[in-house]
């Protein structure tokens, strides 16, 4: 079993579709993919809807865990005003998502599949103990240009979600941590 956070963005979409492809290729039931979207209130409706629609249409085990209250509580506990959109505000979200994915993996006897790509790691666009941490980083060796091209290629493999793949590719790249 695998656990993956699906945001509706480019990196998580490629990682998610790769897992679906792997299941199909090796005759593994897609219910072994535990896909979770973790909105925080800073997500666009486009990425949120892309995530939900992808998970539904690909027939995986999926859920939504809204982390808005949890991150607000964490920010308050450390004395943050919850209004300043600084690095602390952003990183609490990434860390809480990873915390939730890791705990779900423990509960389900699964591993967490990371979605960070090589460009993000090389440029430092990741959160320590957040999105840079996983049990297997499926995108880790791929620069963003390859991520985009490979995601587009999956339209041929999964025509039932080609419209969603187009929407993901056309959406401006953003971590969506500040609203």
Regions found by a protein language model. Give the residues of each.
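A phosphate-binding catalytic loop at a beta-strand-loop-alpha-helix junction
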Residues: 1-26
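General beta-strand structural signal in soluble alpha/beta enzymes
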Residues: 4, 64, 113-115
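Alpha-helix capping and helix-loop boundary segments enriched in small/acidic/polar residues
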Residues: 6-10, 38-46, 62, 88-92, ...
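Amphipathic alpha-helical segments in well-structured domains
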Residues: 16, 48-51, 98, 144
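Short, glycine/charged-enriched secondary-structure capping and boundary segments
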Residues: 18-19, 49-51, 78, 126-130
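Generic long, charged, amphipathic alpha-helical segments
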Residues: 19, 26, 31, 35, ...
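Active-site adenylate/phosphate-handling loop in enzymes that bind or generate adenylated species
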Residues: 22-23, 32, 58, 82-159
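A conserved beta-strand->alpha-helix junction
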Residues: 28, 32-86, 94, 120, ...
